[in-house]
Amino acid sequence: MHVFDAAAVHAALPWPFLIEALRKTHFGPMPASDVVVQSDPAGGEAQFVTLPGWAPGGPVVVKMVGVFPHNAALQPPQPAVQGLVALFDGKTGGPLLAADGAAMTARKTAADSALGAAILAREDVEDLLIVGAGALAPHFAEAHMAARPSLRRVTIWNRTAARAEAVAATLREKGIDATVSGDLDRSVAGADVVSCVTMSDTALVKGALLRPGTHLDLVGAYLPHLREADDAALARGTIFVDSRNNMEGGGDLSQAVASGAITWESVKADLFELVQGKREGRTGRDQITVFKNNGGAHLDLFTASALSETLG
């Protein structure tokens, strides 16, 4: 069995390779998957989540992840999300590889949104706004730039400016033109692509400010009480999701449905339908596209399978 630490995961899965691997696997069927959530028996906010997935005639993945929101306050700080991803032979059950869970999550989550942008964003986009400055932020900037090479500039906004500057500095070290925004509304109005990677429980992106042709990527609101974009953003945009199977769990769509701004029928397609050509993506230059990244064990399986390909 091969073991990949975080550095090995990132090195083995460059963005162009992984985005293309995800595109190819979306030509196949949706794998069987499940989610088992164990809440902290002491009553705290922490959770331990197990996500198994099994492709028909293919391998089995099990992602084991701890979500501990207060880890950032520890000394020294630790990631809020940690775990392991294990891949098994679907015929024998034998273990094939184990990989650092945080690195795998960062890679697959960013590549998921990047594939959405590759299909839905205009081909001439230049300005990318990343809303949020957590661990995923630099990965989302790099993945989007790989998916849409026309992107020239990255702006980072975060409630804590110092954290935004740290992300921007990391990107500049890699030769990316990255700056910090002190005015979210102005940056939203000036962006071609807006990618939200936060844990916000109130809407940050105002739909009225989105200019025609913008691509809006929503990632962080994976629980019903979380929200990254307001009703106007969902109502103005044409909505797409990575998978219809788990699209009702996050707050952006479910809250907009509850308010009457949209219906579940407003979701035009998921990545399987888009990749397979069963549904249309962007149909006009001025169309606002909204992509809701919900994640799921199928993406862990696709990413782990891509990692196994690198073993030869």
Spans of model-derived segments:
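N-terminal Rossmann-fold NAD(P) dinucleotide-binding loop
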Residues: 137-138
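Rossmann-like adenosine-cofactor binding region
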Residues: 174-256, 261
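N-terminal ligand-binding/catalytic initiation module
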Residues: 1-106, 114, 124, 298-301, ...
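Glycine-rich Rossmann-fold phosphate-binding loop(s) that bind the pyrophosphate
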Residues: 133-134
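Adenosine-phosphate binding glycine-rich loop
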Residues: 224-312
